[in-house]
Amino acid sequence: IIRAEGVSIRYITGDFKDIGLKEYVLRKLTGNYQVKEFWADWDVTFELEKGDMLGIVGTNGAGKSTLLKAISGIMVPTRGKIQTNGTVAALLELTSGFDGDLTVRENTYLRGALLGYTRAFMDQMYDEIISFAELQDFQERPFKQLSSGMKSRLAFSIASLVNPDILILDEVLSVGDGSFRQKSGNKMREILANGVTGILVSHSIDQVRELCNKVLWLDHGKQMDFGGTQEVCDRYEAFMQRKK
């Protein structure tokens, strides 16, 4: 259901998008213009079947979030290709796809529309989404007035309750209080039991071991390992111990 073949993603720093058009022209005129290439991911290859849960591990700057953006269709790989079959619900940044001035109710429908769902479908799911997010008393509150925990609960509830084929989570399960983390973990297990394919980025190895059956280990953009959870997590933890 997901196949990545030789995926490499390059950023170019110092072009006019980074420094502004005026500064770009000045640097070109004075001969002080330089661009630098940065490869966030390099030659990443893996394949997931229906119902797999992939954990992506690695330190900050490993290229995890960049890879998720490519899998979600937000970015196009510089090299290689990614194939996904089915609807994708991605929680990469908790506030993306929300409007701070709109209410919780309005944002729920907005986020649903961005995920490709009809108004009628969201009408059916709305009460369940709000109940799972524990936001019954905040439905008419502007989104910007919610705490970060409330925002994360709403984002996770929408993504997990609208029945995607592929669910992508970037550190989402680590946000919120303990009781909601437990509830969201239980929901993830229920989702996987129903055949949804998931990808989880987490700094919690315990969480990856508990929820994932496959693991991809990235380090400075390079694929270090891909395979079964226990084997890859053991090698990753041994690697991190040696670095200390």
Specify the residue positions occupied by each region the protein language model found.
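A short, surface-exposed alpha-helical micro-motif characterized by mixed small hydrophobic
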Residues: 208-210
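Conserved ABC ATPase "signature" C-loop
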Residues: 220-221, 236
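ABC ATPase "signature
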Residues: 226-227
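The feature captures the beta-strand-to-loop junction immediately N-terminal to the Walker
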Residues: 57-59
